[in-house]
Regions:
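Sequence/structural signature of beta-propeller domains
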Residues: 1-295
Length: 295
């Protein structure tokens, strides 16, 4: 499948949930993670708040920037035969080099935390000069992690590794592929999330522009984009990969003006269509949600 048209379905705001940065779908529910939030917000299939899952003991709703874990990426994985929500910190500071696991076979999972510093050190030694992990998905038996560049380091990366890499960080295999979007846009735009839909064999990538020259500071928000790669398993083995298509979200709906898309998830829709759910964090303390239909 190669999407021929993209239509805007709806948008809404989670005014009581801060800084949405990742979204994952499992068993009829959406799991939204905020980069400075103390809980995971669970939504039902109609995007209505269902419950929340605590992931931090910090007493306020938002964790201050210098100490926040900066959870920017999430993915559903099968670990030891159980569906498990994995949430990854950006690793842009020492406090952010961590990963959470939440088993989905219990009503209120207790998160288990793992450091990722050894794995991050190996990525730096392999030539990735700056780490800012922003997305994660599963393609077959591989974990794919998105690393975002910035205006001073204009490289995005897809890091391919194995489930459980956090348990054997010093030996876990990995490979790196750089997505090349130069055929679609001029200038640099940062990779903000990835989502693979096995039912359609499509990898979706979100990008956004932000006026910042490092992995820590926020900047003025520009345009956001969605790109896709069909049959990605065979296309991520080289040093670079090129999307099959890419669109600027402002052209889909004016609702995307001034929105910094941070996360996305893809689910199969009717008649071979695809439904995309996007989350936006505009550094204002709430979360934007958007729904698109691709046919």
């Amino acid at each position: 499948m190669n999407p021929a048209s993209i239509s805007f379905v709806r948008s809404l705001r989670l005014s009581d949930y801060p800084s949405g940065s990742a979204i994952t779908f499992h068993d009829g529910k959406f799991f939204v993670t905020g980069d400075d939030a103390t809980t995971i917000q669970v939504l039902d299939k109609d995007l209505k708040p269902d419950t929340s899952i605590p992931i931090s003991d910090y007493p306020e709703k938002r964790i201050p920037k210098p100490i926040k874990p900066d959870y920017e990426a999430s993915a559903m994985m099968m670990l030891d035969g159980k569906p498990t929500l994995a949430i990854l910190g950006s690793a842009s500071t020492a406090a952010r080099k961590k990963l959470l696991l939440l088993p989905m076979d219990v009503p209120m999972p207790r998160p288990v935390s793992f450091p990722t510093d050894v794995f991050i050190t190996r990525l730096l030694a392999a030539g990735i000069r700056e780490i800012n992990l922003e997305g994660m998905t599963m393609i077959g038996d591989r974990v794919v992690i998105a690393n975002r560049g910035n205006l001073a380091y204009q490289e995005n990366h897809l890091i391919l590794t194995t489930p459980g890499f956090w348990l054997h960080q010093d030996t876990a295999s990995f490979a790196v592929c750089r997505p090349d979007v130069s055929a679609f846009i001029n200038g640099f735009t940062g990779l903000s999330d990835i989502a693979y839909l096995p039912d359609r064999d499509l990898l979706f990538l979100s990008f956004s522009t932000e006026d910042t020259t490092n992995a820590y500071d926020d900047g003025t928000i520009g345009l956001s984009y969605i790109a896709w790669i069909s049959k990605p398993a065979g296309k991520l083995s080289g040093p670079t990969c090129k999307p099959d298509g890419m669109i600027v979200l402002r052209d889909v709906s004016p609702a995307f003006n001034g929105q910094k898309i941070e996360g996305l998830c893809a689910t199969p829709g009717p008649d071979d269509s695809v439904t995309l759910h996007l989350v936006a964090d505009n550094d204002s303390g709430d979360t934007g949600l958007f729904e698109l239909r691709l046919v």
